[in-house]
A protein has these predicted regions:
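Iron-sulfur cluster-binding electron-transfer modules in prokaryotic oxidoreductases
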Residues: 1-178
Length: 178
């Protein structure tokens, strides 16, 4: 709906048929991961779109840092990859006329800094919503998503508890995970 409102022409790709190959890559099956990623890249390239927008940080990181550089012999990838928040923040002028309802809330982010520019983009988008007050919880950030912390369960548990405590201490109305 948001893309429709700001006049973006798009096609939706998703599911296992459009996978980045990260699951195979993580367990050491680079050959299968490469085939999956290359097949998906070919589908994206054949669409003719200059931009591919991902909502999944793992897909974005894997395509941008591993798969696309591997298939781009001439250096330039066949399209630009964007995370959804950065794509929308880059089009904030088109989006602002649609942000008309005041949302009187104190909002904090449980953010993961691994996907470049995402946290900044989300803050920029939040600040554009009338009535939203961004609250910085002043906490340490690690990983690129909560599942990245599964190998350090004690740290993960302490992080979650710390975020919830900080949100309560700062009288946050909404705690968003990014």
């Amino acid at each position: 709906d948001v893309f429709d409102r700001i006049g973006v022409t798009y096609e939706v790709y998703g599911g296992p048929g459009n996978c980045c190959g990260i699951l195979q890559f993580r367990v050491g099956d680079a050959e299968t991961a490469g085939k999956i990623a290359t097949s998906t890249i070919d589908r994206f390239q054949n669409s003719g779109a200059p931009d591919v927008v991902a909502w999944c940080p793992t897909c974005h990181i894997h395509f941008s840092e591993v798969a696309l550089p591997s298939v781009s012999d001439e250096g330039a990838p066949p399209f630009d990859m964007h995370m959804l928040p950065t794509y929308l923040a880059d089009r904030l002028d088109q989006l602002k006329p649609h942000l008309t309802r005041s949302v009187s809330k104190r909002v904090a982010l449980f953010e993961f800094p691994g996907a470049r520019g995402v946290t900044e983009a989300v803050r920029k988008l939040m600040n554009a919503v009338p009535g939203v007050e961004y609250v910085d919880l002043g906490i340490e950030h690690a990983g690129y998503q909560m599942s990245a912390l599964e190998t350090v369960p004690d740290y993960r548990s302490k992080t979650i508890a710390g975020v919830l405590r900080a949100a309560e201490e700062n009288n946050v109305d909404v705690l968003c995970s990014v």
